[in-house]
Amino acid sequence: MMKRLENGQLFTAMCTILIKINFIVYLLKKLYPMKGPLFYAKILLFGEYGIIKDSKGLAIPFSSYKGALKSSSNLSGEALKSNQNLIKLYDYLEANASELVSFDFTSFKNDIGSGMYFDSSIPQGYGVGSSGALVASIYDQYAHNKITILENLTRDKLLKLKEIFSFMESFFHGKSSGLDPLNSYLSLPILINSKTNIEPAGIPSQKEGKGAVFLLDSEQVGETEPMVNIFMNKMKNEGFRKMLNEEFVSYTDACIDDFLHGNINSLFGNVKNLSKVVLANFKPMIPMAFHKIWEQGLKTNDYYLKLCGSGGGGYILGFAQDYEKAKNSLKDYKLELVYRF
């Protein structure tokens, strides 16, 4: 009799605990309705424009900014705008069916109708992969037979993912390498050796030294497609093509090798050369207000600047051997730390 009572009490206690857990889960879903996992921003440390022409690139996840699919029965403001953009993305993917990937369009459409939106802190038009994170989240949620991050990611699987993401992100930019969504989806540093050779990269762990990589906020929104169009027009010029192959790509590749192998002194020499080449040949991609401080960094050696993504606004990437000195030189601007040497 006693055992029965004990068992009965235990059962009742377990039921009570389960009810409480379910109630907490219910409350959390109500307060923070989320359909999918978090996807992070990315920073292309090296390789902007060069990767279009098959040179090296190195991208790293940037966890300060992130986004996730959520839903709300009362959409307004940015959430409503995001929901409307998802409708356009849905229409694009459905109208441009690809053999690369298929989607559960029924669930996708129903979820949009139920108030789904992409809740993101990633600034748009800033070169840190806002559309890439969105594309990664849609693939993760709705792709059939998706390649998961838990699999053994062979080179062929990575290339297929990159191709899928290139197709999906072309909705936003007209032409996409697929690298931003790939980086966001994997949440790993990615080394691009060429269009057909990409791999996860091991980057040196951060140190508590003086040196740093940082973001400089231009406080202007940049658009990728016009910048890429300017670049493609420049590529028609033989002199520009020569500069790209002999200088831009050469310094970019050297920077990547130095960064991955921790050759800091050599890295800053190559970053300075790259910064000079970009200022001389990519001026339309650098906001006018930043031409002088770009030159100032090259003269003083307090910092060196380079494009972050396609340019035209958004963030500018900075490298400094003494971050405190760079902060003092750029005290009138908003800086954000990315990586410590």
Where on the chain are the PLM-derived regions?
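ATP-binding N-lobe of GHMP and related small-molecule kinases
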Residues: Q9, L27-G127, D140-D156, Y304-L307, ...
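Glycine-rich, charge-dense phosphate/pyrophosphate-binding loop(s)
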Residues: E48, I52, V249-F341
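Phosphate-binding site recognition
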Residues: S131
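Alpha/beta catalytic cores of group-transfer enzymes, especially the acyltransferase/condensing modules
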Residues: D156-A201
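Acyltransferase
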Residues: A201-I256
